[in-house]
Regions:
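Conserved thiamine diphosphate
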Residues: 1-136, 142-145, 161
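Short helix-loop-beta junction
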Residues: 146-164
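Glycine/proline-rich, positively charged
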Residues: 168
Length: 168
C-alpha cells in the first residue's frame, strides 16, 4: 500500500500487540528504502498507547520505545502534551519513512492549547520546555510531568532546572 502512494496509519489498541507484527515492522517497513537503494518509500505510521495505563495487566503495560528506537529506518515519536501530539502526528503522516507514534494512555484526558489551524513539528528535534542554569532533565512522554514537578521543587530552593523533551 505504501509503495503505491498511500500513507496508511495502523492503530494498535496497545503497542503490546505490535509484537504480533514486529517482523514486518522491523524487517520490511523499516528497511525497504535501504534494501531498494532508495527506489521505494514506506510512509506508514504505527500509532497507539504505550506503557502503563493503570489497572491493566502486565501484558498491556510494557513500553517498547527503546526497542523501536534501536531499529535503523524507524522514527519514534512520544509526545508529552496535546499541542505536540497534533503537530508531531501531522509530521509523522507526511514523513516518507515509517514512524512509530506512541501515546501515553495516562495523558488521553490531558487538556492544552491546540490551534485549529495547520501546523507541524519537525521530527528529530527536541524541545527545551523550561530554561535552567543548574541542572538539565532530559525526558519524554508522560514523565515530562514529573520533570516539571521536580523542577518546581528545586526552584523553591533556588536551583533552576532546564527541561528538555526529546519528543522524537
Amino acid at each position: 500500500s505504501t509503495m503505491t502512494g498511500n500513507r496508511p496509519i495502523v492503530e494498535y489498541m496497545t503497542f503490546n500487540f505490535s509484537l504480533v507484527g514486529i517482523d514486518q515492522i522491523i524487517n520490511n517497513a523499516a528497511k525497504i528504502r535501504q534494501m531498494s537503494g532508495g527506489q521505494f518509500k514506506c510512509p506508514i505510521v504505527f500509532r497507539g498507547p504505550t506503557a502503563s495505563a493503570g489497572q491493566l495487566a502486565a501484558t498491556h503495560s510494557q513500553a517498547f520505545e527503546s526497542w523501536f528506537a534501536n531499529t535503523p529506518g524507524l522514527k519514534v515519536v512520544v509526545p508529552s502534551n496535546p499541542y505536540d501530539a497534533k503537530g508531531l502526528l501531522k509530521s509523522a503522516i507526511r514523513d516518507d519513512d515509517p514512524v512509530i507514534f506512541m501515546e501515553s494512555e495516562q495523558m488521553y484526558g490531558d487538556k492544552g492549547e491546540v490551534p485549529e489551524g495547520e501546523y507541524t513539528i519537525p521530527l528529530g528535534v527536541a524541545d527545551i520546555k523550561r530554561e535552567g542554569t543548574a541542572v538539565t532533565i532530559v525526558s519524554f512522554g508522560t514523565i515530562i510531568k514529573e520533570a516539571y514537578k521536580a523542577a518546581d521543587e528545586l526552584e523553591n530552593e533556588g536551583i533552576y532546572v532546564e527541561i528538555i523533551d526529546l519528543r522524537t
